[in-house]
Amino acid sequence: MAFFTAASKADFQHQLQTALAQHLGDKALPQVTLFAEQFFSLISLDELTQRRLSDLVGCTLSAWRLLERFDRDQPEVRVYNPDYEKHGWQSTHTAVEVLHPDLPFLVDSVRMELNRRGYSIHTLQTNVLSVRRSAKGELKEILPKGSQGKDVSQESLMYLEIDRCAHAGELRALEKAILEVLGEVRVTVADFEPMKAKARELLTWLGKAKLKVPAEELKEVRSYLEWLLDNHFTFLGYEEFSVADEADGGRMVYDEKSFLGLTRLLRAGLSKDDLHIEDYAVAYLREPVLLSFAKAAHPSRVHRPAYPDYVSIRELDGKGRVIRECRFMGLFTSSVYNESVNDIPFIRGKVAEVMRRSGFDTKAHLGKELAQVLEVLPRDDLFQTPVDELFSTALAIVRIQERNKIRVFLRKDPYGRFCYCLAYVPRDVYSTETRLKIQQVLMERLQASDCEFWTFFSESVLARVQFILRVDPKSRIDIDPARLEEEVIQACRSWQDDYSSLVVENLGEAKGTNVLADFPKGFPAGYRERFAPHFAVVDLQHLLSLSEQRPLVMSFYQPLAQGEQQLHCKLYHADTPLALSDVLPILENLGLRVLGEFPYRLRHQNGREYWIHDFAFTYAEGLDVDIQQLNEILQDAFVHIVSGDAENDAFNRLVLTANLPWRDVALLRAYARYLKQIRLGFDLGYIASALNAHTDIARELVRLFKTRFYLARKLTAEDLEDKQQKLEQAILGALDEVQVLNEDRILRRYLDLIKATLRTNFYQPDGNGQNKSYFSFKFNPKAIPELPRPVPKYEIFVYSPRVEGVHLRGGKVARGGLRWSDREEDFRTEVLGLVKAQQVKNAVIVPVGAKGGFVPRRLPLGGSRDEIQAEAIACYRIFISGLLDITDNLKEGEVVPPANVVRHDEDDPYLVVAADKGTATFSDIANGIAAEYGFWLGDAFASGGSAGYDHKGMGITAKGAWVSVQRHFRERGIDVQKDNISVIGIGDMAGDVFGNGLLMSDKLQLVAAFNHMHIFIDPNPDAASSFVERQRLFNLPRSSWADYDAKLISAGGGIFLRSAKSIAITPEMKARFDIQADRLAPTELIHALLKAPVDLLWNGGIGTYVKSSKETHADVGDKANDGLRVDGRELRAKVVGEGGNLGMTQLARVEFGLHGGANNTDFIDNAGGVDCSDHEVNIKILLNEVVQAGDMTEKQRNALLVKMTDAVGALVLGNNYKQTQALSLAQRRARERIAEYKRLMGDLEARGKLDRALEFLPSDEELAERISAGQGLTRAELSVLISYSKIDLKESLLKSLVPDDDYLTRDMETAFPALLAEKFGDAMRRHRLKREIVSTQIANDLVNHMGITFVQRLKESTGMSAANVAGAYVIVRDVFHLPHWFRQIENLDYQVPADIQLTLMDELMRLGRRATRWFLRSRRNELDAARDVAHFGPRIAALGLKLNELLEGPTRELWQARYQTYVDAGVPELLARMVAGTSHLYTLLPIIEASDVTGQDTAEVAKAYFAVGSALDLTWYLQQITNLPVENNWQALAREAFRDDLDWQQRAITVSVLQMQDGPKEVEARVGLWLEQHLPLVERWRAMLVELRAASGTDYAMYAVANRELMDLAQSSQHGVCIP
């Protein structure tokens, strides 16, 4: 409906006038406008604006037309339904218009008639208009309200809108009735003064007449008439009559000339029956009294809707007989009912007489009580009741004042037309219901046709109800007042009375009385109407059974009056009512269709409320169960759903359909929620419907689970397997009958999951012996079909209605953080992505990757930060408990399985966790829970607690990432500690990684940064002052960019809210960030900042801001940052430092790298945090053993941990340094060695260790394209491969004997601060993770120094295992002291060009590679690290010092050239000498072996070896072999074979030379002699070299032939040595 609006009443009148002008001429408009102002003057603006303006215009014009012509002798009444076509306006109501000369009672009387007929009045407008009319009644003028004058008349105009009358006959009948009422008003008003005159006339007559009446009585009657005339009576009519005798009574004989007022209308045309009166009425009318009272037989239609009162003056003859009666009909005015009885003539005499007869002292209690009773008695009773009856009644009322009981006093009207009843009821039991019961008894016993009542409350304990009942005067019902009173008492015997009796009867008097006192108001009226008291007693007992442990009780019942399919259940609980919107879905999900609900509240005297909810329901379609048989499990299910222990969803229907208890249903739901997380493809509702459609299979699945994890405790392995097989076959057989493919798939996946479940806490009670509120399941992920990749080794799923979470582990010894996720729908997908990154990040530490995530499902909506945090912590505790519930423990070195847990897997006691997003401060909580469980790791369970290393305080993650940044810039000739670099950051100074990172150097020029709230812009910052300000913000708790001192920001900068509509781009911002626009939205500005030319992009925030151009935003999965994100190729930062996780997609990193950017990956850059935590855990495991042995207190342990903080940090940063260095070394040769990486990836894929697509590594086709483009693998891709190579090597070492080798286990010491190795060396060798730590240290050391493909390359070329390769490497490492030389090179940072450093390291790597290969080829399975290092190490050290003295000819020249190059570059001489001779150092291995064979001095053998090489030009030949291009693996293997052959042949010739008989002693002479003795073959060899030098191009075939020639030469001596 369209309403109008108006600012004021004047505004409304203006709008109305404007609208009226469209319907009226200029002449009529002023008058109608004036009329309208008066017409609506009494109506509020609010009421007017609830109506259409068009309707107001219509009713105004309609009323005006009524007013235009009026005959004052004939009132105008119009009752009609406004219709647009007929009347020009319309309304949903019926309109009533009345125009009448202004008279009293008009409005009240019309309104009374409408109410009497049952019409609701919606609009009522009444106005008294001052008008001038013509003689014909035509309206001449409307005058201002209240105008007077000779020709001015006052006319009452009424406009009403009432309920719509549907029929024309109804409209006519109403119009006629209103006209009748108006007629009655007219005669009443017209005769009002004549009636008063008649009263005065009677008053005069009484003063003159000589009546045989006591003077006092006469005086009181006269006083009464005077009092009546003094505005105490509204005269409606007057009549005079006498009584004539008839055989069966009498007859009223009216004097028609006496009629005044209403009697003129009411007495016309009375029939004989109307005039007949009964004999008792005749007797009353002939009583010789002057003044009498009665009630009229019909209600008044004028002024007030009540039965009018008769006040009669009887004229007596000289004998005291009644001659006639002068009777006034009217209504006592309201003042009469408020006036004291002592001020009302006639009544006051009665009251005084009653007081006198009582004998009560008026100042005493009873006297005051009686006076009060008389004061408040209904005036009708006081007027009409004789003194004798009044006395007895008043005294009886006084007697009950102090007693809580019901009394009834009945009095008949003298005419027999009414019965008057006063009922006194105790206030505390009085109600409408009580009044209706009394009324019903009275109506039935008195056969009354109508009843009016008035209720009176005073300070008394009793309430009084006055009933006036209309009865048939002809009926002669003999009523026994005592019996009637008893019937009323019985009728009023309340439900509460019966209830109270039953409570005492059932609970005993003492308890019952107390309970009734506890619930003083008992059950509410609505309850009492529906239930008998004995039901209430049962319900009360249920309420009394409520407790904290049992907060909800449920009861089913079936009313006898209802069908079998309709049931009821009652829910009982305390405090707040159950919301229907909450309960209804629960019942419906249980398979019940709710038909209605009736809530009832009981209030305890202590203020606590108790509730009963009565639900009527039937079964949902398709359900056919016996509710009584399932009563217990259904009640149990409902109670746990309401309490939140179980979820409310479609799975609950299984309670009825499958007869499953709620926990079994919850079990199936938990599996379904896991199925959702592993992306089965069906929503939970469909999964539930599949189970409900096949309840037999659902039951069997639960049986299988119970058998595996409960019955298995009591069964032998054989019996368990037999039972499982039978159940599985039964399920498979049932599945064959399933017709719907999707349902079959769901049910089979349930079977798969149950079989893949290794452990569960489902049957593990809590400390109180109760079922746990959460479930945890340990899975064998490889047994779950179609699990999203990568597939972890183990997985634990924790489920409860409050929280869900998963923990994924890559192996038995695995570690990673637990994050508070907000992705309820796919948190496992989030965790899977993180564990994938964690797996490669953990390549540098002992454990393999693990990750966990939990989602609080019931965070308080609109809760405060503290409330949300509290709930998250509670959920975290549940999650941690779920993990520990099914994890083995260690006690005194023995594995202790968890109690009441059936294990279908091996011992698995290693479980450690760490902080992650949202759980940074939760480590102490986790360790506290671990302590409660007595878990063997103690506070090593969760690193970073109060007795652990504070990552933010140490700044370890940022420092580790800064190592990467330093390397990127160092390799570009920039020292970030000395040279200014421009930075754009993601995050704020309150953050750990961002804040610590931007304090790593005071040379950083932070030109821009942003977080979720602000954008910080400082186009031309001062590095020094901005550093100090950043430091201040970092130290300021909960700081933000808004706290930054704006005075320190350079011109054109500022701090802007991300919520701003737009940001003005200053010239300085345009210049710094290469922006063209004048204004940008905050999102657009951040987008531009990410693409700005800058030295460093430092990511310390949360979110993914860079994708590849081949990816969509949807692929990224970070919707919040879609508007900010840029492509990798759009980045113009020179370097990206990834302190935060997931800032770039992997493909974005690759794209950035391919476009010249310098970056690693997040798991490389920010590995410091996880590395630090691993050191902490390993140290604590070590020291906890020491504490348990009594060799140290926990306090001492904690002090030692603090003392080692810097040492631990140094170890961590050393790992970061080494790993990024290894990446730089790999990147140098990434293009030329691309085939090696291809082979590595292929091998890892073939062994199921790598999913190339999942890790975004290039396919073979993409590698071919890279080769064509002259590109190799990027650092981001190499980061993945270095991690995988370490992981793979660690696994291989753990499966071998390498970690058990006494010599090799010394590497373990490098994982700990030196202080620990010194003090607790023995305990360290007993470390529970000794094998893992040794394997980790060797793998890290090997890959960091020898390269990513080293192990793979040597495995392929030697056929040896990875463990053999690692063992040989350790020998080589220690024989040649490689770590020492690497450190010497690393110490040259910023002293020599980075490229020189990498070249030096390349040479060391080549030495290590060739030497390792030599050991593998020469020793095979006879490697003995301790022996070989002892044998070769000292001799190589000795020879190495004088290597340059041993070299000669071209060999020496080559060495000298290299040496000089290095020295010229700034390399220290000793280091330059060593590295320049690495290729010759390698030859010391065959030299030493030749020495062993010949028994000659090693130095002499070396001279011979190098002399042979010089004589045969083998150094040049070796260089040619080394320079052979490698395009495939076969060529690589051939090249290595050529070198091996050359090594053997040179050694063989050397041995042959040294073993010559009768030769000269000098080496040169012996070599010369040997050459002469083998001259033909020597010449053939030299000729071969000539051809090789002359060849325009060389290929492998040529060198194969050349090698054969050399072999012939080597074997030509009888002293040839067999190839090892």
Curated annotation (Swiss-Prot):
Coiled coil: none annotated. Contains disulfide bonds (interchain). The active site is at 851. GO terms for biological process: glutamate catabolic process. PANTHER family: NAD-SPECIFIC GLUTAMATE DEHYDROGENASE. Induction: Expression induced by arginine in an ArgR-dependent manner (27-fold). Induced to a much lesser extent by ornithine, glutamate, and aspartate (1.7- to 5-fold). This is NAD-specific glutamate dehydrogenase. Activity subject to allosteric control by arginine and citrate, which function as positive and negative effectors, respectively. InterPro entries: Aminoacid_DH-like_N_sf (IPR046346), GDH_C (IPR048381), NAD(P)-bd_dom_sf (IPR036291), NAD-GDH_cat (IPR028971), NAD_Glu_DH_ACT2 (IPR049062), NAD_Glu_DH_ACT3 (IPR049064), NAD_Glu_DH_bac (IPR007780), NAD_Glu_DH_HM1 (IPR049059). Pfam families: Bac_GDH_CD (PF05088), GDH_ACT1 (PF21075), GDH_ACT2 (PF21076), GDH_ACT3 (PF21077), GDH_C (PF21074), GDH_HM1 (PF21073), GDH_HM2 (PF21079), GDH_HM3 (PF21078). Involved in arginine catabolism by converting L-glutamate, into 2-oxoglutarate, which is then channeled into the tricarboxylic acid cycle. Can also utilize other amino acids of the glutamate family. Its EC number is 1.4.1.2. It comes from the Bacteria. It comes from Pseudomonas aeruginosa (strain ATCC 15692 / DSM 22644 / CIP 104116 / JCM 14847 / LMG 12228 / 1C / PRS 101 / PAO1). It catalyses: L-glutamate + NAD(+) + H2O = 2-oxoglutarate + NH4(+) + NADH + H(+). The lineage of its organism: Bacteria, Pseudomonadati, Pseudomonadota, Gammaproteobacteria, Pseudomonadales. Belongs to the Glu/Leu/Phe/Val dehydrogenases family.
